[in-house]
Amino acid sequence: MFLAYRMADSNHFALMGLPRSFSLDPGTLEAAWRRLQAAVHPDRHVQGSGTERRIAMEMATRVNEAYRVLRDPLRRAAYLCELDGVDVRSESNTAMPAEFLMQQMTWRETLEDARAGRDQAALGALAGEVDSARHELLARIRTLLDGQRASQAAADAVRQLMFLERIGEEIDLADDF
């Protein structure tokens, strides 16, 4: 199996043959995934030995996991930080800027008020505001990871992005009432 050497110690970027960067072209990522899946998919190895079939399954699983991580900006940013030795999900590091904490409280109150009042317009406005903040934060993360190589600062921004993703999901759920 020609990819076995890439599987053992490589990170997701190396496995996919892509540069280690937050800024990835989605089309290039998908093309790399399709190319690798075509080579390692277990259906291509049904005539192989049990060991070869098991290795093909492991490789396909690893390629799929790499694709899932790299296609999601939040997971990709967290992964890049972790490659640099910075634990994004560290329970001991939950500090956030006071301004962001205040904004969180405001968004939570707005969400609860809109939910209680079944106010679709307020939910829509909140969704737009959170989405705008998310895009700004993604641009900041891009600068921190690709431009400045500041993984610790990027990890702090990733934790903020995690909150934005959660509240975005809650807004979507509230919008379904």
Regions found by a protein language model. Give the residues of each.
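C-terminal accessory/regulatory regions appended to core domains
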Residues: 1-177
